[in-house]
Amino acid sequence: MLLTFPDSPFQLNQPFPPAGDQPAAIEQLVEGLSDGLSYQTLLGVTGSGKTYTMANVIARTGRPAIIMAHNKTLAAQLYSEMREFFPHNAVEYFVSYYDYYQPEAYVPSRDLFIEKDSSINEHIEQMRLSATKSILERPDCIIVATVSAIYGIGDPSDYHQMILHLKEGETTPQRDIISRLTTMQYSRNDLDFGRGTFRVRGDVIDIYPAESSDTALRVSLFDDEVETLTLFDPLTGTTKQRVGRYTVFPSSHYVTPRDTVLRACEQIKDELRHRIEWYQKEGKLVEAQRIEQRTRFDLEMLYEMGFCKGIENYSRHFSGRGPGDPPPTLIDYLPKNALMFIDESHVTVPQVGAMYKGDAARKANLVEYGFRLPSAADNRPLKFHEFEQLMPQTIFVSATPAVYEKDHAGQVVEQVVRPTGLVDPEIEIRPVATQVDDLLSEIRERMARGERVLVTTLTKRMAEQLADYYTEHGVKVRYLHSDIDTVERVEIIRDLRLGMFDVLIGINLLREGLDIPEVSLVAILDADKEGFLRSERSLIQTIGRAARNLRGKALLYADRITDSMRKAMDETERRRAKQMAFNAEHGIVPKGVEKKIKDIIDGVYSVEAERKKLVDEAAVAMMDEKTLSKEIKRLEKEMMEAARNLEFERAARIRDELKQLKEKAWLSDL
């Protein structure tokens, strides 16, 4: 059911009306915003529907919003949920576009210079460009971002200057359009038409906007007049619709007008001269020669091409900022009436504060030893006090607010009662001596009921040994650790939900915001070892992972009750009592959370398809040698036929099946 609110551009898809503590929380937060409170805190327990409350606040106030999360996995989960709540509004995703990133660095002790090396994810880059386009074009915009939002991107005023407006009936020579596209960092490619390129055929210019994944623009000219503007599918060429006007946005956040580049080059030359003089005065001749050689090469590239490798290190000169001024970031693109939500704020806020310090330490060596000019230090993330100055009206969202949120809370809004009636997990304390075998018997009980288990240990070594031990005893177990990349982490969590394994072991990766309703047992090993992994906040967060299940239970293995354990148990008990009183008063029978299993960024996973895949794998495992050989020959023939008929996708699918069968055949030959 789609709901609209007065003076709000948002259409909220409301699968159910707010319940439990949600109506009061929504009302208090909206009231706090209209009263002009700069900061508020939503203290919401796991499973109380904090994301739904955020969506309601955005829809009712009608203001654009940015939601910040502390990692890509949680940001992707929030993005997916917000897209469901706002199917007709601009919900965008802004995270770091690097799949791999090795920053430039110098290690003086080994005289080792490490070149910058990175691999950019095209899909995420397109989503980032789409995010800035939506902010500039639409009032109904919601951006889900990570701390990537505090890193410098192009100056909004330069970005605005570079936008190309096209309108039917307008006089614009073809040469001017091509020239503008080139300065916007679009490249001409008449053969391979992809994102960020354009092609020219007679009087027709086809432009593939950098922020679009499936729509291109065809500009048909009659002499110097724009005759028609048409949107079409770049793959099939099918016309989608004719438009009267269209705005083409730059191909990168870092585009710069030509006169700005020339002005910046003069400033860089000036800084270089001063720096060489300083090195010579200090007797550092190697550094003087190094900085001159590197900077002159970059200047040559800037004059000829308009950009160079590592152009971000000269960003201060391009944006015209003074030394030490904050860089332009995504937050500068936000309209003045924007809202900010900081999800899992007890982790996200400290993370924002830590970003600048790490970056500054690395840059200091590069500047000192002549690899970069001093202005490179101003290509940096925001300092915490700069971030605070830019923050619009902000709502901190957390089950366990930290000191910063408590000090800055205009009001604290509690959302402790769950609409589903689910009660916080029951907590049991058991001795450490028998923890491994005791947990094994509990796991078997859960496996028999088709439920899942999360186990948190203190060290990687303990997690690995535990995973090996349980595997030997016939338990399907996986181990989650910091070396696993974002995409694989999402897949592991999805596989746990699908039942491809029953137990997930981790260290501190099980804490914030993992939404796994199938988990009925959380086990915390060595719970009495005080430290940040066993602090009151960590324990409450970890216990909360079982709060989405009807039979949720938390086992704390400890020989004594620490202060942190006592506080976590008291807080959980307080929440249990409040929920049970609410259930009794309203006659609510608790029911488990049912949640579709989604591909966090691209939509919804088909459980049936996954199960079919598992069945197919099992069928392969059952084949004898003769059947296997026959099946391989049949598939090879089918694959060649598909390739001859130009059915390449089908051929690729068969090839993957063949690979699986050949692996099985090879293993059986051993």
Swiss-Prot record:
Domain UVR: 629-664
UniProt cross-references to SUPFAM superfamilies, sorted A to Z: C-terminal UvrC-binding domain of UvrB, P-loop containing nucleoside triphosphate hydrolases
Main location: cytoplasm
Subcellular location: Cytoplasm
One term of GO molecular function: ATP hydrolysis activity
Motif (Beta-hairpin): 97-120
Comment block on domains: The beta-hairpin motif is involved in DNA binding.
Oligomer status and interactors: Forms a heterotetramer with UvrA during the search for lesions. Interacts with UvrC in an incision complex.
Similarity remark: Belongs to the UvrB family.
Annotated protein name in UniProt: UvrABC system protein B
Source organism of this protein record: Chromobacterium violaceum (strain ATCC 12472 / DSM 30191 / JCM 1249 / CCUG 213 / NBRC 12614 / NCIMB 9131 / NCTC 9757 / MK)
